[in-house]
């Protein structure tokens, strides 16, 4: 969002203005703490899209509302919006929250450690699995939900199971954000 606006403005010789930053860090301190002090949770998600969508579609005054917003693209971020601030959200890029069309999402820690030390993958390959070659594409060879839905209509049970799992994981993340808003 922000980089694209800057590029277009530069080409046109004008200034660019955006309403929200592409990434923002408004997370509650308690939301950052994990079971390993050297691995805090980070605020990396689709902030610009989430805030704009909330303002446009909630039908309420955003700054006076508590909302849960799910951005569902190649990466999926689910944010708890409390009175205009996103106080908790999964890191949609680095392996937190639901898996997505091309991102791995949360992975059981001990299983990931086994894979890391298996000698079968390089560091770069594993980072790609987390951020661009994981999720639905790792199971089905495509990141297109439309193609997966077509496969399901043709009777592909594996495609149905993977898409059901994606939806299930998004639903769980929405539930987690409901708990974050309840305090």
Q: For each of these PLM feature ranges, what is it?
A:
Residues 3, 44-52, 107-110, 121, ...:
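Conserved active-site and cofactor/substrate-binding residues in soluble primary-metabolism enzymes
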Residues 128-182:
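Adenine-nucleotide phosphate-binding core of ATP-dependent small-molecule kinases
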Residues 31-118:
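Glycine-rich phosphate-binding loop of actin/hexokinase-like ATP-binding domains
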Residues 1-22:
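Conserved phosphate-binding loops in N-terminal lobes of ATP-dependent enzymes
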Residues 26-29, 139-140:
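Short acidic/His/Gly/Ser-rich catalytic and metal-binding motifs that mark active-site loops
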Residues 94-99, 109-110, 123, 130-138, ...:
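Active-site C-terminal subdomain of aminotransferase-like
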Residues 2, 75-79, 173:
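Short glycine/serine/threonine-rich phosphate/pyrophosphate-binding segments
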Residues 20-25, 133:
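Short glycine-enriched loops at secondary-structure junctions
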């Amino acid at each position: 969002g922000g980089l694209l606006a800057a590029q277009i403005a530069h080409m046109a010789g004008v200034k660019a203005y955006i309403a929200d930053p592409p990434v923002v860090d408004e997370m509650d301190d308690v939301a950052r703490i994990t079971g390993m002090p050297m691995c805090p949770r980070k605020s990396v998600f689709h902030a610009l899209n989430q805030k704009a969508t909330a303002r446009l579609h909630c039908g309420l005054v955003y700054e006076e509302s508590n909302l849960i917003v799910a951005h569902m693209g190649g990466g999926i971020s689910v944010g708890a919006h409390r009175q205009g601030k996103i106080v908790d959200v999964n890191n949609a890029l680095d392996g937190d929250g639901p898996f997505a069309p091309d991102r791995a999402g949360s992975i059981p820690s001990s299983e990931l450690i086994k894979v890391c030390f298996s000698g079968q993958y390089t560091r770069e390959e594993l980072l790609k699995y987390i951020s661009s070659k994981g999720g639905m594409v790792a199971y089905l060879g495509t990141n297109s939900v439309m193609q997966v839905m077509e496969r399901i209509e043709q009777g592909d049970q594996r495609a149905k199971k993977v898409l059901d799992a994606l939806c299930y994981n998004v639903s769980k993340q929405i539930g987690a954000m409901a708990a974050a808003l309840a305090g």
